[in-house]
A protein has these predicted regions:
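Conserved structural position within tetratricopeptide repeats
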Residues: 37, 501-505, 534-538, 568-572, ...
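TPR alpha-solenoid repeat register
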Residues: 479, 512, 546, 580, ...
């Protein structure tokens, strides 16, 4: 198919999908018939012709006024079939693309596809795991017989190798249904969500949710499927597991921030402390702590004894790691791009086993590799990365010394790696299996060389309650609150605000309203933030935190009278805080209540005599009230202690108003050492003119300063 035909097919597909979304079935059928003709899809063209004729007859009977109680049900069937045919034609179009990874892989499997059907695809045929994976991923929508055969196969008892093959099959079904919706595969995933095997159940549940996020609009057309989902939600343990999945999906939103934080924030801090020591920017948290310990550096404090940024990073990332966040994306990114092993899609989803045909035989008996795989919280593809990396290193590097150090770093026992993998229990909890699989899926979607051929669910809205029927199944206030708190911890402010907003207002706590207000602040919704803080204050009066947020918002909005009320209450709760006294003074100055402002400023100066902030404010207040000699006295103190450009500018005003224009010019020039601005007096023109200077005086002073 050439580019012109490809563009036409894509245009017709988009037109058909839009018509279906707009409930214009006849227009959709016309576009689909055009697609079928272009793609030379004879069977689809014939069915579309029959469907169009049947719909014409239905419309004809309706126009004649004929009573037909089944008319609406028939119309829904026509719509569903039109959606299914649009998917079938979309797949045909993809296969006709000469350069697409989907089509290229499909053509490579041609010998295996001879006489192929879904029933013959069952693993008894003796195909390799990779061939099975590709055949399933590339499979057409299942027929009823194929769906039944696969459903039976998944419920057959199996040993470990058969279980791994079944897990691969579930992942392949997931990728297939994500790309081209197939209700039969979706139903299989629903049934497998009740599997007693943890690995299989995790993959089925993740697959079900990913397919649903992408194709929720299709699912609603299948009442039997919606009913199954509702029954599934009532199954024992399902809601707890779906909540764990939701939390893990939220954590994936942090992966990029963690990767950037480790490389751009934490590592520069460590490098600064390590000075001469060389560090690799892909070190893990424990390795960073070890390096700091070796250098006799305390990560909690700076050299002057103040809390360090590094301590904050370590605590934040350690908490994220404990909750199951992906801390190793950056570490394994280069490895996965280096080994041909990861150019094969199936290998990203292959449950870890030393019996994988591409893993060196001696890796299984290497105690260091065994210890790493057991002790570190790694997804399956990361474990394969370790095995492949180890196979390239000299034997002495992976010996007992390294094993002992790794055991100490992971807080484990080095003897755990001495027994072969097969003799150790491999059962994982649902949460562990879920973390591993979601992280592995995330890596595939972001690192696989042909990732553009697959739909990336992590780019979608990850909150399940935004999609029917989960919007009616996951509406409990406690669930929404827990999810909102998780999003808040992850600094996903917009998501957290949306979740808090969905909660029943009467059931929200003061703390949740506080967090809702903070999220609204972070996303620029100032009015929403004010409303949330006011509600929190009414539910829990005299909260210092709430009052500070409210006061800051009122102040930033220029409502200084309301801000003043908040600061006065704060001052009564914490009378010894210099910052509160300064804020009180600021509000009083804006309200032209200068006598009160001076009282607050003298108190701030008494509470914090070493700070120049009260001096600056006192100088400015004296300037505003015409007490220029006192203003000058305080500006001299300010100028003696690391003055800012604003300090030099305001001190220039004081000198000029005291009748010392020479000193004023020098100070003005120091306020603008790099680039002189001819408008530097504009902001304070009213103050200067109120003191008796004319517009001409300001113009001449501007020229005197700028013409050096």
């Amino acid at each position: 198919m050439d580019k012109s035909q490809s563009d036409t097919y894509k245009y017709l597909l988009a037109d058909a999908r839009k018509a279906l979304a707009d409930n214009r079935l006849f227009s959709a059928l016309e576009s689909l018939r055009g697609m079928a003709t272009l793609l030379k899809a004879g069977s689809e063209a014939d069915e579309l012709a029959r469907l169009t004729e049947a719909y014409r007859q239905l419309l004809d009977y309706m126009v004649r006024g004929a009573a037909d109680p089944a008319r609406n049900a028939m119309y829904r069937k026509f719509v569903v079939r039109a959606y299914e045919l649009s998917t079938a034609l979309e797949r045909r179009g993809e296969l006709a693309e000469e350069s697409s990874f989907y089509a290229l892989t499909y053509r490579k499997l041609s010998p295996l596809r001879e006489g192929f059907s879904g029933e013959q695809m069952l693993p008894q045929s003796g195909w390799s795991e990779q061939e099975l994976f590709n055949l399933l991923w590339l499979s057409a929508p299942f027929t009823p017989a194929e769906e039944a055969a696969w459903s039976d196969w998944f419920t057959t008892p199996r040993d470990d190798d058969a279980l791994y093959r079944a897990c691969l099959a579930v992942s392949a079904l997931t990728l297939s249904a994500m790309r081209f919706f197939d209700v039969a595969k979706y139903r299989i995933l629903i049934d497998l969500c009740l599997s007693s095997d943890v690995m299989l159940r995790v993959r089925a549940m993740v697959g079900l949710i990913f397919v649903h996020l992408i194709h929720a609009e299709h699912v609603k057309f299948y009442p039997d499927v919606v009913s199954r989902l509702q029954l599934l939600s009532d199954a024992a343990g399902f809601r707890q597991e779906i909540e764990l999945l939701q939390a893990q999906l939220f954590l994936t939103l942090e992966t990029q921030r963690i990767e950037q934080g480790l490389q751009k924030e934490m590592m520069p801090e460590v490098m600064k402390r390590m000075k001469g020591l060389r560090l690799n920017q892909t070190l893990g948290l424990e390795e960073l702590k070890d390096k700091l310990s070796e250098a006799d550096l305390n990560p909690e404090w700076e050299e002057d004894g103040t809390p360090s940024k590094l301590a904050g990073y370590l605590r934040e990332f350690a908490e994220l790691q404990q909750r199951g966040a992906d801390m190793y994306m950056g570490t394994f990114k280069m490895l996965k791009q280096r080994f041909p092993f990861f150019s094969v899609a199936a290998n990203w989803f292959w449950p870890f086993t030393f019996r994988h045909p591409d893993i060196p035989a001696d890796a299984r008996n290497n105690p260091t590799i065994n210890l790493l795989i057991r002790g570190a919280a790694l997804c399956d593809s990361d474990k394969y990365s370790f095995c492949l990396m180890a196979s390239m290193l000299p034997g002495n590097v992976m010996g007992e010394g390294l094993k002992q150090k790794l055991a100490e770093a992971m807080g484990g026992d080095a003897s755990l790696g001495t027994e072969p993998w097969a003799n150790q229990p491999t059962e994982m909890t649902f949460k562990e299996a879920l973390r591993s699989y979601v992280q592995g899926f995330y890596r595939f979607c972001h690192l696989f060389v042909h990732r553009e051929a697959f739909v990336n669910p992590f780019k979608l809205d990850m909150f399940l309650a935004d999609y029917p029927p989960f919007d009616s199944l996951l509406v409990e206030n406690d669930f929404l609150g827990r999810m909102a708190d998780l999003a808040f911890k992850d600094k996903s402010w917009l998501l957290a605000f949306g979740l808090y907003s969905r909660m029943n207002p009467d059931a929200c706590t003061a703390g949740q309203y506080q967090r809702m207000g903070y999220c609204a602040e972070q996303t620029g919704q100032k009015q929403k933030a004010l409303e949330a803080y006011i509600t929190a204050d009414s539910m829990k009066p005299h909260s210092v935190w709430t009052l500070r947020r409210l006061a800051a918002l009122w102040r930033n909005e220029g409502l200084y009278d309301k801000a003043l009320n908040c600061y006065e209450e704060l001052d009564s709760l914490e009378p010894d805080h210099a910052d509160t006294s300064l804020r009180l003074a600021e509000c009083c100055i804006h309200l032209k209540r200068y006598d009160e402002a001076f009282k607050h400023l003298f108190k701030a100066n008494w509470l914090d005599p070493d700070s120049t902030l009260p001096h600056r404010a006192l100088a400015w207040c004296y300037l505003l009230t015409g007490q220029y000699d006192k203003a000058e006295r305080y500006y001299q103190k300010v100028l003696a202690d690391e003055p800012t450009s604003a300090d030099w500018l305001n001190a220039g005003h004081a000198a000029w108003l005291l009748g010392n224009p020479t000193e004023a010019v020098e100070r003005y020039r120091k306020a603008m050492p790099q680039q002189l601005s001819e408008n530097f007096l504009c902001d304070d023109a009213a103050l200067l003119q109120a003191a008796g200077l004319s517009a001409d005086d300001l113009a001449m002073m501007t020229d005197a300063v700028c013409s050096r």
